[in-house]
């Protein structure tokens, strides 16, 4: 989700990035550009300027606390950033997106990587301490993917079916629970085999996003085997012929398959491909964020300013692509930097 001035929220859902009427965080990115138009302009990041080293001193401790999904990506950014500023010390703690808001509010981290939106209660806690909301900067695009074992012949799923597989509530409208592969139409050895469920725990932003958009805010079945990280989910599915799980697209391996998804039972399932995400056709595309404590009307200190400039530069977005995610584009990056108090590149 991306929140714009005036109460407009844009989020990936149901085959397009829909404007909603709930304002959570006043971020100016994309205030001028529609998301689909801005992203479609450039899916490679080549329009972004290269990073230019700052003329003044940039030093200190760069500590990031938050999303496990973004752990490797943040490490790539830190590695590239230190090539320009070797004296910078970095520390990365991937405890889950839920750990970012309190760490940022309490001042124990520099940035809070998150793979989900801030909850209203988290924003209120931050505002009660600082008097203004956190700034949330979109830094990459991810596709949340449903994985099955590489030998599984399943051709596609609707979100209604995903809900009936993972949720005990079936808020998405399915009339019956889905417990076996035969319930999805598979034959032969698969027909009677129970579906083994793998997922994340409640501290994970991926868990929260999947719960909201794939489970229609329903509750997970108690049979979901919670894993400590995104890669652990994929490894579990790779080791379980009858398993299914969800994780970010960047964790795809040769031992699992990404299942094409459809927003509705009437729609054709769409593979998790870049073109589909940029066009708004893949139903579980989402922004990844860096949250920062930025007092409105001020500029960030050199360390935070330059790290954001690096992340949203050609080099930083090349790291995004290297880690299996999709880059944001120049219009998105430029507006996000302005919103975060970075006056120029």
Question: What are these regions, as identified by a protein language model?
Answer:
Residues 1-19:
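N-terminal secretory signal peptides that target proteins for export/translocation
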Residues 22-36:
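Bacterial N-terminal signal peptides
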Residues 40-345:
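Flexible loop/hinge segments at secondary-structure junctions
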């Amino acid at each position: 989700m991306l929140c714009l001035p005036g109460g407009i929220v844009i989020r990936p859902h149901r085959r397009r990035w829909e404007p909603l009427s709930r304002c959570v965080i006043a971020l100016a990115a994309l205030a001028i550009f529609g998301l689909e138009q801005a992203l479609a302009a450039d899916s490679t990041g080549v329009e972004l300027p290269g990073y230019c080293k700052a003329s003044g001193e940039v030093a200190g401790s760069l500590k990031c606390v938050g999303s496990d999904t973004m752990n490797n990506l943040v490490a790539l950014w830190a590695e590239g950033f230190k090539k320009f500023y070797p004296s910078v010390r970095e520390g990365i703690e991937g405890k889950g997106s839920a750990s970012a808001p309190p760490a940022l509010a309490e001042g124990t981290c520099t940035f809070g990587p998150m793979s989900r939106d801030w909850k209203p209660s988290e924003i209120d806690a931050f505002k009660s301490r600082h008097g203004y909301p956190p700034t949330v900067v979109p830094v990459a695009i991810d596709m949340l993917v449903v994985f099955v074992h590489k030998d599984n012949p399943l051709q596609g799923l609707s979100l209604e079916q995903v809900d009936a597989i993972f949720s005990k509530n079936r808020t998405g409208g399915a009339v019956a629970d889905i417990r076996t592969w035969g319930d999805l139409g598979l034959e032969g050895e698969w027909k009677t085999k129970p579906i083994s469920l793998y997922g994340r725990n409640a501290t994970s932003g991926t868990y929260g996003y999947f719960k909201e958009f794939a489970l229609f805010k329903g509750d997970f079945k108690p049979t979901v085997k919670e894993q400590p990280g995104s890669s652990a989910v994929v490894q579990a599915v790779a080791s379980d012929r009858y398993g299914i799980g969800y994780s970010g697209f960047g964790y795809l391996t040769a031992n699992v398959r990404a299942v094409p998804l459809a927003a509705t039972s009437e729609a054709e399932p769409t593979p998790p491909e870049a073109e589909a995400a940029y066009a708004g056709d893949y139903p579980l595309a989402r922004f990844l964020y860096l949250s920062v404590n930025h007092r409105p009307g001020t500029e960030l200190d050199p360390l935070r300013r330059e790290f954001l400039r690096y992340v949203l530069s050609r080099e930083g977005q090349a790291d995004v692509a290297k880690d299996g995610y999709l880059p944001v584009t120049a219009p998105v990056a430029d507006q996000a930097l302005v919103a975060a108090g970075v006056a120029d590149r």
